Amino acid sequence: PVPAQQRLGEEALAAGTESLRQRLADDEPIEALVRDRARMVDVVLRRAWALHAGPRGKDVALIAVGGYGRGELHPCSDIDALILLPKSEVAGDHEGIERFLAFLWDIGLEVGHSVRTIDDCQRESAADVSVATTLIEARLLSGPDYLFQAMRRALAQDSVWSSQAFFEAKVAEQQARHHRHHDTAYNLEPNVKTSPGGLRDIQTIGWVAKRHFGAETFDELVDHGFLTAAELRKLRTAQAFLWKVRFALHVITGRREDRLLFDHQIRLARMF
């Protein structure tokens, strides 16, 4: 028989997913759906951590990173988590962590995870801008806040990425990505996430702003004189449209599909 906790987890995820599907059909604001999906996963991960991490779990920080760290999830988005250890000696005790991850797998929630110390985070961020970017958007789910704040301070140092170096690396990354899409936003089957003008470009603005200004929201970019109020409204409108397209693609296909393929275009159009 399926263990009771596993069954409850499966049922909670299924009910939450169906609720989001219905709310999309009812044309609820997409911003609420994207954030509520992240909140739903928060509840599941916190509960699973409390159940399975064991007594040493209280000394370890469970942290949402990447898009999940931003509090933005689509139905089949990547869910990425960092398990932050206070010191390397604890790394040998993986039993509670393994139980936690196995439970998530059993209930059908695939979570990409890394297990690191603060020194690991600092070293790997300095070596790879994609790691630095993922950790910029960290959000504490469970565990000691002092450990989480110590990681944030370590990663904020210019020795990891100065604002200028980070900006240049993200521009180079963007140019390479655009080139893979033939430098055009006008493909007949665009990728709403990675094509020029897609969600990744909007996210890049947020990453650079966070590294340079410490800005947590796009609204703060108006305060810094980086955007006008009119530009902010346009940006939010574009983001909401792309979010709805991506959310609907995941619902229609039941998988992480970000390409606006011909097969989906008519059905998707009827949802707008």
Predicted regions and their residues:
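A nucleotide- and high-energy phosphate-metabolite-utilizing enzyme signature
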Residues: 1-272
